Amino acid sequence: MKERMQKTLAEVKGCPQKDRTESEGYVGAQTFMWICEDNIVEVPFDKEHLLERIISPDNLLKAYKAVQRNKGCSGIDKMSCEQMLPWLLANKDALIRSLLDGSYRPNLVKRVEIPKDNGKMRLLGIPTVIDRLVQQAINQTLTPIYERQFSPRSYGFRPRRGCHDALRGAQKIIDDGYIYVVDLDLERFFDTVSHSKLIEILSRTIKDGRVISLIHKYLRSGVMNKGMFEASEEGTPQGGPLSPLLSNIMLNELDKELTSRGLPFVRYADDSMIFCKSKRAAKRVKESVTRFIEGKLHLKVNRDKTVVSYVQGVKYLGYSFYVMKGKCQLTVHPKAKSKMKAKLKELTSRSNGWGYAKRKQKLEEYIRGWVGYHHLANMKRFLMKTDEWLRRRLRMCIWKSWKRVKTRIANLIKCGIDKYQAYMWGNSRLGYWRIAGSYILCRAITNEKLSMAGYATLMGSYIEWHPK
């Protein structure tokens, strides 16, 4: 189906498989943490024969399921996730052979540009589905090995950790009196990772040269950008399953340095905050850490965006902090509030042509997701005020959907408005937004009626997280 023999899966029934217990007898075997769905168990791994574990049928099958579950766009070969299984069934043996003998070559990565909030573009790299399969298999094998090395203050792209854990960790540090922060900004981190430095760090743990070579091939596979080839001299393009793990392995060197200095910090991917008790100490830390990052890790610190400040108002993962009565509290950052209102405005646009059912569904999905992420924040007053604004937007949509004067009059009467007022307002030339805020429409379409009709509210979702 494709000319080049890429990798294989493991829904494959004829491939030799080492049982996990076999590795106990390997010379020089070490133990690492195998992360299962329900618990974490210790499993020996042979640092000289790691590739065999990566391409084992059970690991490849798990990787195949993960790639299918995540779906995603096709790469430059245009193979979809649905086409992956037939290809693997036909080419599995050739793929495994090429991985074992080192002849395997990853395809070019397809460049995709995603707009950022600041108007710039985020560069993503979309590997082919077969490349994603092999990367996922590598990721599944290396993750439990490196989990034991990672700092407990690192939260991004790790099992059973997330943004909320990072925020709670920051709260605890601030509660201990570390009220000044170095808000560290790495300039284009994913695009500027030094390949040689990363390979050096990987080689300290991974002693199977075939695995190191395979990872190096992915790093240097090249990019297809608008039909033009671009060499990959540095960076770990975002978009592949392996990139998050490699970024954590690289930045774990920074974590170890900060820990050795006794500096409290939190890190989510490349978004780090280092805490100090005084502004003077924070300035010293900023300078020394910048020298370490640029001198030892060969990364670039954005000196304009890396700032020292009091914790109040600092933006981190969509939240900001403030201290009240000696305790750190969380609130939603103003930029996150503005972005949320802009999205709600889009979902309640008068001109998107959606029916009632689709609008309700879209609103509920977005509101539940947004509140679910920001539920740690103290934001009742903001949510109540935003709900008032949202209900007015909904009344505006409903009023517009009635269209004709005759329909408006009839519906106002059905909603309990007397005939005279229904006639007057039905013939009104006021704009949609003004009528939506009028006492007549608020009487006709009450908050209770909107709730009974199934429209979600921000406070309703917030109360689900905070029932008391």
Predicted regions located by residue number:
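Non-catalytic, polymerase-adjacent accessory regions of viral genome-replication enzymes
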Residues: M1-L89
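Amphipathic alpha-helical blocks
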Residues: C73, Q83-L108
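Conserved polymerase palm-domain catalytic core
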Residues: S98-E113, D117, Q149-G313
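Conserved phosphate-binding loops in nucleotide/dinucleotide-binding enzymes
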Residues: L123-L124, T128, Q329-L330
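Nucleotide/phosphate-binding loop and acidic/charged catalytic motifs
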Residues: I138
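A conserved non-catalytic segment of reverse transcriptases
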Residues: R220, K296-R368
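Right-hand nucleic-acid polymerase module
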Residues: C328, L347-R408
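Extended C-terminal regions of large enzymes
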Residues: R393, I398, W402-K468
